[in-house]
């Protein structure tokens, strides 16, 4: 595409300690009302005008300050995780560190990045609904713990025994998308495992709050203080989105068709 050709033409492959730093994020974009497109159309309420809403998913090079990929979705069908895996899978970049916020926390996303040969650094939830909640972690404000977690969607009696070791085994239900395990299996089919390698890192950011990060960066090369610094760099994509939408006038698009955005 023209976008990808342009990105490659200005690509200087600037690296941070030998790694290309990419951030991924999403942002909504209003376009002119088009009621013929129900997947993005929102009728006006309380005197407001009707509009159509798109969701832009983008991958941004934090050192070169350029977008290296983007995927536009209609708002009612938006799926940031699907957009992330699509951009990772189709990328021609051989090695990169992908930084992302909590909305991208999923085993499937981590698996796609790992299988690409990239590294990831993603802020994750501290509560009961995320990856960290299923692991036995230190009850401290600061730690750095490695994991080699085997995922399976099988639930035989033997597997249930293995799952008691929750720092080494995890069951993935068939309702959760995971592209590296068979979607269906018969009762007597052998169990299939997919192994994820990562660290869970936690550190305080104030007297009352902590951040929790999942990453597969090598601990000896990137200790905890480097993880703090790298995560702070992720905010560069927030600034770039703000500049794109306000400074460059992306808030005032007149196209009614997604293809023209």
Give residue spans per PLM region.
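Internal glycine-rich, Lys/Arg-flanked active-site/core loops of soluble domains
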Residues: 1-10
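Extracytosolic and intramembrane catalytic regions of membrane-associated proteins
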Residues: 42
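Single, function-defining residue in the core of a domain
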Residues: 1, 16-20, 24-37, 45-261
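P-loop NTPase switch module centered on the Walker A-proximal segment
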Residues: 13
């Amino acid at each position: 595409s023209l976008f990808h050709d342009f990105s490659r033409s200005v690509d200087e492959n600037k690296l941070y300690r030998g790694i290309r730093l990419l951030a991924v994020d999403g942002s909504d974009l209003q376009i002119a009302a088009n009621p013929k497109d129900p997947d993005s159309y929102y009728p006006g309420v309380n005197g407001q005008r009707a509009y159509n809403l798109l969701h832009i998913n983008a991958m941004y090079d934090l050192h070169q300050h350029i977008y290296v990929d983007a995927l536009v979705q209609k708002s009612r069908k938006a799926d940031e995780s699907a957009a992330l895996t699509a951009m990772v899978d189709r990328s021609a970049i051989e090695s990169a560190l992908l930084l992302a916020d909590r909305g991208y926390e999923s085993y499937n996303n981590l698996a796609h990045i790992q299988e690409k040969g990239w590294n990831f650094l993603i802020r994750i939830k501290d509560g009961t609904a995320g990856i960290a909640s299923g692991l036995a972690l230190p009850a401290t404000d600061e730690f750095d713990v490695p994991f080699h977690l085997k995922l399976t969607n099988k639930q035989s009696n033997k597997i249930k025994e293995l799952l008691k070791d929750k720092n080494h085994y995890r069951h993935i239900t068939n309702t959760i998308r995971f592209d590296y395990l068979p979607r269906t299996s018969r009762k007597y089919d052998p169990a299939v495992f997919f192994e994820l390698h990562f660290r869970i890192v936690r550190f305080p950011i104030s007297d009352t709050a902590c951040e929790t990060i999942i990453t597969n960066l090598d601990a000896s090369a990137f200790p905890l203080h480097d993880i703090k610094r790298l995560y702070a760099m992720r905010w560069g994509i927030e600034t770039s989105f703000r500049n794109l939408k306000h400074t460059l006038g992306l808030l005032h698009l007149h196209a009614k068709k997604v293809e023209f955005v």
